[in-house]
Amino acid sequence: MKKAILMMTFGSPEEITFEGVADFFTNIRRGVRPQDHEIQTLYDNYVRIGGTPLQKITRQEVALVEARLGNEYSVYFANKFSSPFIPDVIGQMEADGIEQCICLILEPHYSFYSVMGYEKFLESKQIQFLVIKDWYQEEALLNYWADEIAKILKEEVKQDSFKVIFSAHSVPIFALDFGDPYIDQIFENSKLVAEKLGLSSEQYTNTWQSESDIGIPWIKPDVLEYLREQTEHPDHYIFVPISFISEHIEVLFDNDVECYDLCQEFGVNYHRPPMPNTDSRLIDALVNTVRVNENQEFKEFLPEEETFDELVPSDETKNILAESEDLQMPEFVKKLIEKKGRENVKMPYLIKKMLEKAGKLPKE
């Protein structure tokens, strides 16, 4: 039986031009082109950091995993929102005769927004898949963060006052209502690293970053808001973007530009440990994650035809809408539910699945 590992990541623009960024942004928005001013802002941010190394780094990570596991598995790489796209790579895997595939998402934590967003592309009548849900507890990865933070404390902070700020990509606040495990996993991850360092609860905190402006509330505190709200600052802030493993715009701009600029304004020393990137400890974590999970059950993924636009029976919409305030449901979902003149309304697939998990919508 031919087996494979499919390593997947979010993706990035194929070229740093206005239209290159526009194409990537449009893919993220599911084919709806953002307004020009939104594209311009993102384009300017990419220009400010000199482009993004994400694809280069990810391909190097893939090559290093392949060097360790290539005798047993064919190793493939795909992006969610840029080339090579997941469906295209699955097509190539089918042509190569692959029958079983371990899916390793290069995001250590499980979230409905991340893992479920990848699963929807896993459609094949030939290949059975095993999706690894999370791997943030891998000892090698925990040691990486603890070791790199310890270096900063020893070599740069020394006896000065400091605070370690663990930050993670934010998610919409209604994730709390749906029981998304991501938030608790971030807190646990931070605590595990802090314990390795012997930090007291006063020496570290958790914040969120990189939220999108799509008209819905996100988990707080945002890292920039946290910094602005402090009445006193330590001598040093150590920023640890723990939900990421590679350098990309949400680290190089959101941390190294925006957080750095605020530290300069407040007269505080800015530090950020290097991202794991291609470090051997990260590769150890990825390889061990495969080893720990490789004997689990593989299964077919045959999503319904209408992945992002599932049909919701109209007689259920009133109850959903009545509870939408408590759920802090996004306006765009309310508008979908409120549509008149049809027997069914369409609801984004992800929202439907989250409603099911929250017990707000009967499972089919």
From Swiss-Prot:
Q: Which reaction does it catalyse?
A: Fe-coproporphyrin III + 2 H(+) = coproporphyrin III + Fe(2+)
Which EC class does it fall in?
lyase
The yes or no answer to whether the keyword Lyase is present is yes
Would the keyword Lyase be found if you checked this record's keyword annotation?
Answer: yes
Q: In which pathway does it act?
A: Porphyrin-containing compound metabolism; protoheme biosynthesis
MF terms per GO, please? ferrochelatase activity; metal ion binding
User: Where in or outside the cell?
Assistant: Cytoplasm
Binding-site residues for Fe(2+), renumbered to this chain: 169, 250
Q: Which InterPro entries match?
A: Ferrochelatase (IPR001015), Ferrochelatase_AS (IPR019772), Ferrochelatase_C (IPR033644), Ferrochelatase_N (IPR033659)
What superkingdom does the record give?
A: Bacteria
Where is it chiefly localized?
A: cytoplasm
Q: Which family does it belong to?
A: Belongs to the ferrochelatase family.
**What is the annotated role of this protein in its UniProt record?**
Involved in coproporphyrin-dependent heme b biosynthesis. Catalyzes the insertion of ferrous iron into coproporphyrin III to form Fe-coproporphyrin III.
Protein known as:
Coproporphyrin III ferrochelatase
Question: Per UniProt, what is the name of the gene that codes for the protein in this document?
Answer: cpfC
